[in-house]
Structure formats: structure tokens, C-alpha cells
């Protein structure tokens, strides 16, 4: 590409390109403010979804003015994008840790446990994800068809290899993964229903341990190679 020229005392000389200024590191206060906003946004988005949530609601939940919030996040989409990226990184970590070199039954048991722990510890994130799915995942479809699909394909291949080696019973690995997602995330997405039906005697924190024992029996008994 030829150099850009500017006029200077009747002569054309190459213009010097300005180098981009280095991004300034965030201060501790800026990071703390962003964390407050993201925490408030998680509450609002998990209740109302992306479309129903407003900047005003998030600012009110964060206890700050709307102009102050917009200084850190100029658009609602930026807040949502940051939340979804953090959530997906956390959400997919247990599946990433699914070890092809491990013993199949303990690996699957550990995965079920981790997913239930996440349903217990991150219910708002789970509901945020469910809301996004119900809206057709317009802001997540690239990740679902890319990073998520690649990861599930990889772990489905691990499950198929275990089946071929006779270590677990043969079944559809994709629907096995979907079923683990559905049954574990139910305890976050439908938490109110679960507690209402179980009642005060069984609807406390112990419900997650009860669920873990049930789901382990449901999945692992069916996957043991001599179970069919």
C-alpha cells in the first residue's frame, strides 16, 4: 500500500501513523464497581431474561446511578456478553475435566456430582442460561455450534470408546450427556417447584444429596456393563 501523503509547505511527505495508545490497566475500584454491576445484572437477567431486563433495573439493583453504570458498560449487551462468557467458562469446566484415562463409572459419578453442585451454588447462572435457550439463544448460537459442540463431540467419543471396550453399557452418548444436564440443572431452574413439592422436611440443603444418590443410581446402574 503506498504511503498516505499530506501537504507540507507545498511538498508531499509521508504521513506518520499514530500508534494506538496502550490500554490503561483498571484500578481496584474500577474492578470492584464492575463486579457490583455484574452481580446486580445476574439477578436482573436471571429473573427477566435479556429482553425484559433494563439498564435502569440493573443500576437500581447495583445501588448506583444509570450514568455511573454506563461509564463502565455503555450498553446492556456488553453486560450480558460478559456474564454469559464467565458463566459458560464455569459451566463447561466439569465436562472439560471428564478424563478419558480415568475409570468410567467414577468419572461419570464425579460429573453428576459436579453438575449438581453447580445447580446448588450457581442457580442464577443456570436460570440465565435457560432464559437464553428459551429465547432461541441469539447471543450464544455461535458458541453452541462451535465451542460447545466441539467439546461434546470430544466427550461423546470418550464415552463411545468406553462402550467399545466393554467398560460401560452401550447407549447414545449424546443423549446420555443431555440427560445428565437436564436432571441436574432441574434443581436450579425449577428450584421453587422442587422445594414446594418436597416440603419443609425434605426441601432443605439435603435435597441435593438425596438427588445425587438418586441420579447416581439411575445413571450408573444403567451404565454398568453387566446391567443389560
Give the positions of each predicted feature.
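Amphipathic alpha-helical linker/stalk segments
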Residues: 81-110, 152-161
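Helix-turn-helix
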Residues: 36, 44-78, 82
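A contiguous binding-surface segment within folded domains or other stable secondary-structure elements
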Residues: 130-160
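Hydrophobic/aromatic residues within well-ordered alpha-helical segments
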Residues: 33, 76, 83, 87, ...
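Short hydrophobic clusters on alpha-helical segments that form packing/core surfaces
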Residues: 33, 37-45, 115, 219
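Amphipathic alpha-helical segments used for helix-helix packing
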Residues: 107, 120-142, 190-198
Amino acid at each position: 500500500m503506498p504511503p498516505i501523503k499530506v501537504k507540507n509547505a507545498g511538498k508531499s511527505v509521508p504521513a506518520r501513523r499514530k500508534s494506538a495508545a496502550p490500554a490503561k490497566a483498571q484500578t481496584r475500584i474500577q474492578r470492584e464497581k464492575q463486579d457490583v454491576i455484574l452481580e446486580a445484572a445476574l439477578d436482573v437477567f436471571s429473573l427477566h431474561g435479556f429482553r425484559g431486563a433494563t439498564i435502569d433495573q440493573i443500576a437500581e439493583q447495583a445501588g448506583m446511578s444509570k450514568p455511573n453504570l454506563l461509564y463502565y458498560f455503555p450498553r446492556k449487551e456488553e453486560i450480558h456478553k460478559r456474564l454469559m462468557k464467565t458463566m459458560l467458562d464455569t459451566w463447561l469446566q466439569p465436562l472439560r475435566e471428564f478424563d478419558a484415562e480415568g475409570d468410567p463409572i467414577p468419572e461419570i459419578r464425579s460429573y453428576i456430582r459436579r453438575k449438581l453442585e453447580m445447580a446448588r451454588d450457581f442457580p442464577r447462572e443456570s436460570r440465565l442460561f435457560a432464559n437464553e435457550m428459551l429465547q432461541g439463544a441469539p447471543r450464544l448460537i455461535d458458541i453452541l455450534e462451535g465451542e460447545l459442540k466441539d467439546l461434546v463431540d470430544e466427550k461423546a467419543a470418550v464415552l463411545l470408546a468406553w462402550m467399545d471396550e466393554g467398560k460401560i453399557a452401550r447407549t447414545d452418548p449424546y443423549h446420555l450427556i443431555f440427560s445428565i444436564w437436564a436432571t441436574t440443572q432441574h434443581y436450579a431452574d425449577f428450584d421453587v417447584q422442587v422445594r414446594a413439592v418436597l416440603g419443609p422436611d425434605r426441601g432443605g440443603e439435603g435435597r441435593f444429596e438425596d438427588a445425587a444418590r438418586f441420579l447416581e443410581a439411575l445413571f450408573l446402574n444403567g451404565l454398568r456393563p453387566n446391567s443389560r
